[in-house]
Structure formats: structure tokens, C-alpha cells
Amino acid sequence: MNNRVQFYKIIDNISSFNRLSHAYLIEVDNYDDDYQCILDFVKLILCGRNDKNSKCLNCGNCNICSQIDSGNYVDLKIIEPDGNLIRKKQMTSLQEEFNNKSLLDNKRIYIIEECEKMNQSSANTILKFLEEPEDDVVAILIADNRYHVIDTIISRCQIISKRKFCL
């Protein structure tokens, strides 16, 4: 089974059994190739048309999916490395933003791309956020190799691997 199909099967199971975790570490082969899969996972969590009888994976018809596709969904924050690092100030800013309630009365999601680029200071800052999650917040951390992420972060996340091979 190819990795994309396997990934969609995993996220479909998460939805079907209503087992949404507060934090995911998604291990990818290629950020660019796998990014749409990550956005589809976000849509599955947030889509206004998603219910137990109807799955939404990239429906493209509702406001939420359209806003996610255009990068304008207010309760989705994407953190990218600043140069070669994810810095403490980025994590502090994220925490401040997510201390407020959702503007849309829905889940709030943050994605940390290349989370293996967190230094010890930024990892410690986000760790407390992962240890004491708000009910309406979901973290999605993306790494090309989970073994490059600090153990305390890994231990607080559900791991989903899209890699073509396991180490």
C-alpha cells in the first residue's frame, strides 16, 4: 500500500473512532510532497461538513476548507524555521496567540514544520504547551526524522509515519 493511501487510512480511522489526540508528530519523506496530506488532516479535524456519516477530506466546498486552502483560516497557525532554527520567540508568540479562545468556536490547530529544528530553549517552551493542552487545541509537528526530535516532545505526541522506510 502506498504511503499516501496508508496515511489517509490512518486519519480516517482517527476520525471514524473519534480518537483525536491533542498532539501529533508526523514523520514525512518530503515536506513539499506531503504537505497536502497534512492540510487534508487539518480539514478533517475542522471541516464544518464533517460528521460521523460524512467524511470531509478536501471537500473544497465549505468555507473552512476554502480558507485552509487559501491560507486564511484564522485558527490555523503554521510555524516555519527562522533560518536554520525554530526559535523560542516563535514558540512564545504561538502560546500567546493560542491562550485566547477560538474566533470561530472550533478547534485551533498549530503546525510546526521541521520541528527537529527546535533548539533546547524553543523545545522547552512548547513542551509545557504540550503537557497541559487546552481542549480545543491540536498540535501537528512535522519532521523528516522523528529520531531528531527531542524525546520529551516525542513522548507527548501520537506518531504517524509517512516515510517510505522505517528506521
Outline where the language-model segments fall.
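Conserved catalytic/switch belt of AAA+ P-loop NTPases
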Residues: N99, N124-L141
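A short beta-strand-to-loop transition that corresponds to the Sensor-1 phosphate-sensing loop
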Residues: E114, L141-R146, R163-C166
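A short helix-turn-beta junction within AAA+ P-loop NTPase domains corresponding to the substrate/partner-engaging
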Residues: D151-K164
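ATP/adenylate-binding site constellation spanning eukaryotic-like Ser/Thr protein kinases
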Residues: Y73, M91, A123, R146, ...
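Conserved adenine-binding aromatic site and its adjacent loop/helix in ATP-hydrolyzing domains
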Residues: E96, K128, S155
